[in-house]
């Protein structure tokens, strides 16, 4: 011990020197090797056991991956050596998870701020709606402002109705005078007149449908009260052929069918502007119309105990005015001929 303290390089006995060297200098050399070259044994450790992956705190974060089996040493500013482990063929290809961890460097992992910025960029900027401006939309709907309703007394209503019957659209001066008289504002007077006009119009529309059924009922009553004892429908066709079917009283000729092939040419009983006299219809006589040559007319006279209540139907002839202006026998002569024919057939 004394020799080592004085000069460790003095020649000594080899046996003592070896003992001293084993006891004192060996731990120093081992510790020096462990501190100075901790990474030189890493390739050998990786070759022996590939599952063990040492992580050095001095490993560079900005490294370019290269296909190299040898480690690269670099001297930092502090003078300490640092090793850069590059992914290569040293690792077992059966470990994809470890390989992916080594392939991605720390600067390639996205940070939280970049993820947040990308998320906001995908959504776009939040812009307020131009319809609302700077106001914020609230989920709670605001309550509607209820209008104040003016309540009028009976005296005020009477005054207003009296003026309404005189003038439904009062002028501004009249509204001001009514406002002073009633004790309200001119705007309230205008609102009252507007509402009262709408009310009166609604009531008038409701009364119109109620009046229509009454008029229909009165017309039906009038039509039922009018009664003709013996009525005869008369129908004139467009081509000049006509047919009458009449109902006569009990003293009439029973069930007669009469037809005539030939007839005097061009005459009519009732033209387009003249109706047959009503007295003939009331007396039970049937009028006869004129026909052209070569056309036949069938007159059917039917009798019955009951009196038919049918209105008289007249259809004007569509022949030209020259037929209406032709000269022919009068109506009385025609009736006389018909009665004579009936008497001959009855005998």
Swiss-Prot record:
Keyword DNA-binding among record annotations: yes
Residues annotated to bind DNA: 145-204
InterPro entries documented for this protein: Distal-less_Homeobox_TF, HD, Homeobox_CS, Homeodomain-like_sf
Region (Disordered): 1-20, 54-86
Superkingdom of the organism of origin: Eukaryota
Keyword DNA-binding applies: yes
Entries under SUPFAM superfamilies matching the protein: Homeodomain-like
Tissues in which the UniProt entry reports expression: Specifically expressed in early embryos.
Effect of inactivating the gene: No visible phenotype; mice are viable and fertile.
Keywords: Developmental protein, DNA-binding, Homeobox, Nucleus, Transcription, Transcription regulation
Compartment(s) where it occurs, according to its Swiss-Prot or TrEMBL record: Nucleus
Pfam families in the cross-refs: Homeodomain
Compositional bias (Polar residues): 72-85
Stated role: Transcription factor required for zygotic genome activation (ZGA), a critical event in early embryonic development during which the developmental control passes from maternally provided mRNAs to the expression of the zygotic genome after fertilization.
UniProt protein name: Oocyte-specific homeobox protein 6
Encoding gene per record: Obox6
